């Protein structure tokens, strides 16, 4: 593979943020400048709270800017499974909150969002039956969900879902919070963090509280979360624009292990096959591998019927929780954490960003409890 490990979303028009240079003082230090961290920073600024945000690389350099660009309602588990695992009240509350959040994202960054819905396509007869169970459960609760049987396969159409450019959205948010008074620093990896202090090689941030808003490698940064959180490598590729196939909306297949969409310019982007590569994909390494990339390309050629050349190959780290619900709560004295979105951080992560601010500043547990149940405040 000779292609650079760069996502299709990157238009090369971003000027990297500076690194921290010396000690600074602030009210809250947010570690992680992805979608959830930037949402937390927005919320802090709205409350008049001084804030410094840092990232080991740059804005949305991790999964926040390197994912498939899906805005999906609901929890990690399909709705009927979420009802079984977490109870109907929580499953419904999460679904309603994510529907509202998708609209909020569209209103805040309309140039990055396309309200086109999404398709869940079954790979087996067993999955067709599972789709029918999901349809029954959702319709029984008055949620939008339509049966689909057409050109792209058999499954479900979700009208409330959307497509977006995740990197463009995060860069827009970063630009806004900078203009609103936040201080943001890139290339500033954390060496140590504790109550009142975040240390890096370039200086120390003295603060009243720390919010860790990291998804992939959360278990590396906060080792106490190991056993509840595990980081995986998610790989993707994109093709040149093509008219060989028209994909009307974000589509996920084989219970979500494969996922693809067609961008406005006609290019096709696809990710998946993490499970087929076995234990090797439970790793902190974000280098694309020949094995998974070959499976992705074969799927594009054989299943989707697209022969357009591959233009991008990339990977990112994403953390998965043992419950399917995110990490959200106090993890050390003066330190709160959000992350481990299990591949669904585009929407859930934004909700967690606001919920953790309410938790850390006010001790208000209600927004967090809606998402994860009992929390440590």
Task: Explain the meaning of each model-derived region.
Residues 1-10, 77-83, 103-175, 179-180, ...:
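Flavin (FAD/FMN) cofactor-binding and adjacent substrate-gating region
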Residues 1-28:
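Extreme N-terminal leader/targeting segments of oxidoreductases
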Residues 24-53:
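N-terminal Rossmann-like FAD-binding beta1-loop-alpha1 element of flavoenzymes
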Residues 46-66:
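Glycine-rich FAD pyrophosphate-binding loop
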Residues 68-71, 75-76, 80, 116-121, ...:
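Central beta-strand plus flanking loop segment that forms part of the substrate or channel wall
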Residues 160, 298-377:
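C-terminal catalytic lobe of FAD-dependent flavoproteins
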Residues 193-268:
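Flavin-dependent oxidoreductases
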Residues 243-331:
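Active-site lid/adjacent beta-loop-alpha segment flanking the redox-cofactor pocket in flavoenzymes
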């Amino acid at each position: 593979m000779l292609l650079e490990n760069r996502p299709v979303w990157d238009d090369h028009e971003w000027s990297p943020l500076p690194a921290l240079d010396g000690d600074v003082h602030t009210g809250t230090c947010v570690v992680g400048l992805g979608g959830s961290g930037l949402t937390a920073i927005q919320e802090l600024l709205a409350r008049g709270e001084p804030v410094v945000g840092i990232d080991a690389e740059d804005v949305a350099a991790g999964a926040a800017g390197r994912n498939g660009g899906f805005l999906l309602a609901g929890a990690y588990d399909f709705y009927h499974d979420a009802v079984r695992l977490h109870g109907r009240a929580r499953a419904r509350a999460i679904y309603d909150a994510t529907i509202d959040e998708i609209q909020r994202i569209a209103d805040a960054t309309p140039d990055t969002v396309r309200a086109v819905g999404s398709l869940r396509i079954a790979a087996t007869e067993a999955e067709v039956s599972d789709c029918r169970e999901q349809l029954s459960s959702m319709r029984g609760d008055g949620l939008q969900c339509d049966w689909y049987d057409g050109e792209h396969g058999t499954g479900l159409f979700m009208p409330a879902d959307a497509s977006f450019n995740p990197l463009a959205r995060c860069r827009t948010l970063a630009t806004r919070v900078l203009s609103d008074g936040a201080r943001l620093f890139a290339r500033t990896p954390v060496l140590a963090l504790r109550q009142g202090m975040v240390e890096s090689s370039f200086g120390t941030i003295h603060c009243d509280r720390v919010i860790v808003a990291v998804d992939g490698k959360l278990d590396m940064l906060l080792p106490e979360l190991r056993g509840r959180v595990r980081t995986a490598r998610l790989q993707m590729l994109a093709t040149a624009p093509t008219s060989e196939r028209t994909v009307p909306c974000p589509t996920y297949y084989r219970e979500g292990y494969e996922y693809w969409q067609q961008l406005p310019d006609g290019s096709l982007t696809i990710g998946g096959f993490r499970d087929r590569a076995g234990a090797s994909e439970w790793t902190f390494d974000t280098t694309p591998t020949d094995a998974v990339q070959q499976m992705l390309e074969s799927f594009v050629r054989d299943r989707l019927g697209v022969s357009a050349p591959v233009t991008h190959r990339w990977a990112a780290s994403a953390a998965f929780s043992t419950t399917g619900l995110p990490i959200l709560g106090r993890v050390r004295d003066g330190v709160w954490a959000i992350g481990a979105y299990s591949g669904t951080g585009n929407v859930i992560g934004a909700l967690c960003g606001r919920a953790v601010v309410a938790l850390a500043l006010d001790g208000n547990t209600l927004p967090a409890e809606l998402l994860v149940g009992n929390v440590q405040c």
